[in-house]
Amino acid sequence: WSERYAAQAEILRYIGHVADRFDLRSLIRFETRVVSATYDDDAGVWTVRTNRGDSFRARFCIMATGCLSVPNTPDIPGLADFGGTVLHTAQWPHQPVDFTGKRVGVVGTGSSGIQAIPVIAETARQLTVFQRTPNFSLPSRNRPLTEQDHAQFEAGFEAYLESLQHSDFGRVPPGAATAPVPPRDVQWQRYEALWQEGGGAILYAFPNILTHHGVNDVACDFVRGKIREAVHDPLTADDLCPTNHPLGVKRICVDSGYFETFNRPDVTLINLRREPIERFTPTGVQTSERMIELDMLVFATSFDAITGALLAMDISGRDGRTLKEAWADGP
């Protein structure tokens, strides 16, 4: 890769390279959606039908639909009435989006929102961020990768692959973790070093950071302290500090200048716990306290996770029982 966190265009080129190298395109039916999968008890096979009218029969039907593939858009009254541009971070246009001089609203401060907000703020006339739940985010420290970086990686490639087989999340911890519970000042020093390193390294600071409340509490205090250092307005800083979940139990986000973005005079944070959205209007958003005029609206509201793609299809198993029936009370 050309940088520590490769951008979309570079990742897309790599995917295209893999598809061409292994002649995968000939095995893929593009612009085709599966609408149903029905199991035949007598024959012991599945019949899969698509929106193009095709049908396929197979002994095995593997649903590789992914956990995060169906975008989630909140059901808020009036969205269809909004006269501006509506985007979702999970369905981004192939063409560049120009926010120059626009009044933009971003709904959501999860992974994609945290990545998009600093970039949008660079050119938007006014950016309003609507946040329900703040999230922990760590600095990415993104940078171009040098020839030395590549040489070091290639020299230890076999050992690196072996270590990945025994790691969680498919990554190698950035150094030996200390056990069991060091003093608070020792924890703080290690967190500071890993904060400067960037990425999700803090999650690997100590082996019990995800299982020991005391260790995790110190980590949370450290990150919240960094947020308050970065954000000048105390109320905004408090609103951006997560307090209802430990560090690491939700997916850790990484960012480039996310918290600092809220120091800009043209960026406003709306805490939806205090000031919920009541409805969208043709010209913007009506909250419980004010009307906010917008030209563009960006939903960074994640996905219908885990089951969304599966329940979107009509899947019937043994005895004609549908997946929706089987999972009526949860999967």
Per-region residue spans from a language model:
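Beta1/beta-strand and adjacent pyrophosphate-binding region of the FAD-binding site
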Residues: 100-110
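A short, basic/flexible loop-to-alpha-helix module at the beginning of a structural domain
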Residues: 89-101
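N-terminal FAD-binding dinucleotide-binding subdomain shared by FAD-dependent oxidases/monooxygenases
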Residues: 1-80, 84, 95-96, 109, ...
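Aromatic pocket-lining residues of Rossmann-like dinucleotide-binding sites
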Residues: 116-120
